């Protein structure tokens, strides 16, 4: 009986080894196939000629955002006393004359296929400008709330959402302002907007907004 059990165990072990070897080989083949497909697609992308990108959906920074030295004494005083807030504000205003594009969720290969490899450097710069902008907006909006300036925070945070920010604090801070004045329909609209995001932060944002609606 003992030898029979040993033989049975060895048979099972041998089967498991064969199955494992097969799975490894199949995984290796799939990986090679995906890698080959990527290389072929990347090669095609690198051969696409430069295309006109002047009519893309560029983001502009509006003139109706709160400004220093415009008669808003609360805003002036807060920024003059807080270097972090002033830094975020200067970042935002410093991007006014730069090109900004929200290219979140679009790979470099896709950009080259759509607009030509020669445009990749410029497009990456414009997307980096977008990332810099939404970070500064979220930071400034949060700081304004902390300093009880919800009116100015509202302006910046709503602008951030309007241009497609995927920063969690932008959504949550804005929802907090809405909740304080029972604007729950606006929180629901925020949730709909968050559902359109292509970022990893989407599910977490939606979950937090759902909790605020309970």
How would you name each of these model-derived features?
Residues 169-170, 204:
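TPR alpha-solenoid repeat register
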Residues 136-137, 171:
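TPR repeat positional signature
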């Amino acid at each position: 009986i003992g030898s029979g059990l040993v033989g049975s165990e060895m048979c099972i072990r041998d089967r498991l080894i064969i199955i494992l070897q097969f799975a490894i080989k199949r995984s290796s083949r799939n990986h090679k196939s995906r890698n080959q497909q990527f290389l072929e697609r990347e090669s095609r992308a690198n051969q696409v000629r430069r295309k006109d990108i002047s009519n893309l959906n560029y983001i502009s920074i509006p003139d109706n955002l709160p400004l220093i030295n415009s008669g808003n004494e609360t805003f002036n005083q807060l920024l003059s006393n807080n270097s972090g807030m002033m830094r975020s504000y200067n970042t935002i205003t410093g991007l006014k004359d730069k090109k900004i594009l929200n290219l979140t969720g679009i790979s470099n290969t896709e950009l080259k296929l759509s607009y030509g490899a020669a445009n990749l450097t410029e497009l990456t710069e414009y997307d980096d400008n977008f990332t810099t902008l939404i970070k500064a907006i979220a930071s400034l909006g949060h700081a304004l709330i902390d300093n009880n300036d919800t009116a100015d925070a509202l302006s910046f945070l709503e602008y951030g959402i309007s241009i497609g920010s995927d920063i969690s604090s932008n959504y949550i801070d804005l929802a907090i302002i809405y909740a304080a004045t029972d604007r729950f329909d606006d929180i629901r609209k925020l949730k709909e907007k968050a559902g359109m995001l292509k970022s990893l932060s989407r599910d977490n944002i939606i979950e937090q907004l759902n909790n605020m609606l309970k």
